[in-house]
Amino acid sequence: MVLHSKVAIVGAGAVGASTAYALMFKNICTEIIIVDVNPDIVQAQVLDLADAASISHTPIRAGSAEEAGQADIVVITAGAKQREGEPRTKLIERNFRVLQSIIGGMQPIRPDAVILVVANPVDILTHIAKTLSGLPPNQVIGSGTYLDTTRLRVHLGDVFDVNPQSVHAFVLGEHGDSQMIAWEAASIGGQPLTSFPEFAKLDKTAISKAISGKAMEIIRLKGATFYGIGACAADLVHTIMLNRKSVHPVSVYVEKYGATFSMPAKLGWRGVEQIYEVPLTEEEEALLVKSVEALKSVEYSSTKVPEKKVHATSFSKSSC
């Protein structure tokens, strides 16, 4: 039974539209609304997607930030893009203002809503969204390393000649340069990956770089990535809506570390229902801690940016 049915996608760019498109064909939403500061791009995306909606039978329309606040699930894809030569701290500060405007415009947010942050840097923005929204930590999640994990499983599936869905392996930590692969816990058919003869031949450093660098290669060739992350975001919405209780690596607040980063989490209609500890080697644990500590320093400073009272109308004046 579908416990959630109305989804709001905040951000009508390529990622937001790709998410809407992928979600439409799952036929699980009673309604999808798209929200953006640019009315022309919203209208264009809705008109285009409406043609596909006639086949999927999922209603889609433009909506307001206030309406988004009353949706069952809110997917935030809007965010400021990094300017050439801009320090990361400045980008985060600008994205803080964007999120502040978005979430301020959504108030009052329904208390049982689930927010899924897709915009980058996703771990930091998820942490900020948790702080600004006032929702319980389990109801604010980020797409995190879900796409990275998918890429890893596809790669290992090719190496070991199995369906990627039969590969159980996770990319953990930051969705970014410091992310790490939990090799010790990886398995195929219940057999540890480390026990396969092929494992010793793997260039794990090269694989890690290829997984984390794939997005930049796509951006270099065509300017942006959106289909893969759109499909992943739609799948996460699907998991939450149907209360599937599936385990995915998503960006969540982990109390043990006091930070927001990707760990395997069971997802249901309440959002995160359980976070799983992954067995790691000492070396892997050190890499994860290093990744988390780097995020913590930024997450802490980002949530210390002085907050301003934001009204619903201010969202329409922000640049996303």
UniProtKB/Swiss-Prot annotation:
It comes from the Eukaryota. Keywords: Cytoplasm, NAD, Oxidoreductase. Substrate binds at residues 88, 120, 151. Pathway: Fermentation; pyruvate fermentation to lactate; (S)-lactate from pyruvate: step 1/1. One of its GO terms (molecular function) is L-lactate dehydrogenase activity. It is found in: Cytoplasm. NAD(+) binds at residue 120. Its EC number is 1.1.1.27. Its main location: cytoplasm. Pfam families: Ldh_1_C (PF02866), Ldh_1_N (PF00056). Converts pyruvate to lactate. Homotetramer. Belongs to the LDH/MDH superfamily. LDH family. This is L-lactate dehydrogenase A. The lineage of its organism: Eukaryota, Fungi, Fungi incertae sedis, Mucoromycota, Mucoromycotina. The gene is LDHA.
